[in-house]
């Protein structure tokens, strides 16, 4: 029932978009159909990403362990489990793109948009040769990487054995 709210909001602005979205939700819940059918977004999500040079750096406060937590602490709450030796279910079409294209243009956004910290840029020794690392064991299967990657270079596949998060304790 809420599938059209964000596309309507994006197209018509805050007030008209939310009004039309509420009307559409009302029709979907009461009458069983969406007033506007399925409204598509204007463009793909990965096309909306701004270059790092166009954005200011956000300095987030340190987590306190009571109200805010580190990303990997939150991953542990999901009950994520992948067997050792399991093949990686996240693949890159071109392994050079994260470091050669996404890092200079976007400061490699995968390390920020992934809620589980699966992707990271590792800098060793002289700090001159960055390396893109995939920590697939942390993956909570949200598929954000498949949707948001600006180069559409990351492919998410279902892991073998259906392993992954177990959200029963969240």
Regions found by a protein language model. Give the residues of each.
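Helix-rich C-terminal "cap"/substrate-channel and partner-interaction subdomain
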Residues: 1-98
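Iron-sulfur cluster-binding cysteine motifs and their immediate structural context
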Residues: 105-136, 143-168
